Amino acid sequence: MTHVEVVATIAPQLYIEETLIQKINHRIDAIDVLELRIDQIENVTVNQVAEMITKLKVMQDSFKLLVTYRTKLQGGYGQFTNDLYLNLISDLANINGIDMIDIEWQADIDIEKHQRIITHLQQYNKEVVISHHNFESTPPLDELQFIFFKMQKFNPEYVKLAVMPHNKNDVLNLLQAMSTFSDTMDCKVVGISMSKLGLISRTAQGVFGGALTYGCIGEPQAPGQIDVTDLKAQVTLY
């Protein structure tokens, strides 16, 4: 069984309000990583992100900071073209205080360009979470394993795969793919079966070799997320 860090996802509208700071502080003991979603901010800039990071830095000794721009293609609000998206991800390397950066994987990506950006982020001491999300369904087991395999070829620190289950077998396939991958590959793995049906993938993440589990602060930011305080308590049981 692996050690699991609890990620708390926040999605502020440009400014970090004092009420949000209070909510984070109230749950500080349950948070290992704070995920700052930025795709909900229209035409977000690096300078705007840097300002938010400065506000969060006050508490940063308590947790690592992950920045994520989730594109509409993978279930987020982000409307950037692929080039604008990749330029933003690359430029995040210059912001002090960011520990981890999410970069999406698709089957049709420019492999060489993706690798250059990932290497660039790592040269600035940013841990890379390469991720793929399917909000419609759960692919067959062999396809799940193939996606994990393709993502790990970029040598990231983490590979994350989140899929939508329609039955218990979908959940089992995701857990099996994650477990097999964690036993055979060097990078850390994250596997999420979304919605209430897949909640066990969040609470028992470590049993199947997972390294991160995502919760929320108040309103869920993805199907199946529960408050990080409850999530931490559940993860600790394992």
UniProtKB/Swiss-Prot annotation:
Q: What class of enzyme is it?
A: lyase
Ligand binding (3-dehydroquinate): E35, L36, R37, R70, R202, Q225
The residues responsible for catalysis, as annotated, are: H133, K160
> What is its pathway?
Metabolic intermediate biosynthesis; chorismate biosynthesis; chorismate from D-erythrose 4-phosphate and phosphoenolpyruvate: step 3/7
Question: Pfam family of this protein, just one?
Answer: DHquinase_I
Q: What is its EC number?
A: 4.2.1.10
Name the InterPro entries for this protein. Aldolase_TIM (IPR013785), DHquinase_I (IPR001381), Type-I_3-dehydroquinase (IPR050146)
**What reaction does this enzyme carry out catalytically?**
3-dehydroquinate = 3-dehydroshikimate + H2O
GO BP: any one term: amino acid biosynthetic process
The protein's matches in Gene3D superfamilies, at most eight in alphabetical order, are given as: Aldolase class I
Functional description taken from the UniProt entry = Involved in the third step of the chorismate pathway, which leads to the biosynthesis of aromatic amino acids. Catalyzes the cis-dehydration of 3-dehydroquinate (DHQ) and introduces the first double bond of the aromatic ring to yield 3-dehydroshikimate.
Under NCBIfam families, the record lists:
aroD
| Subunit (UniProt) | Homodimer.
Protein name, as recorded: 3-dehydroquinate dehydratase
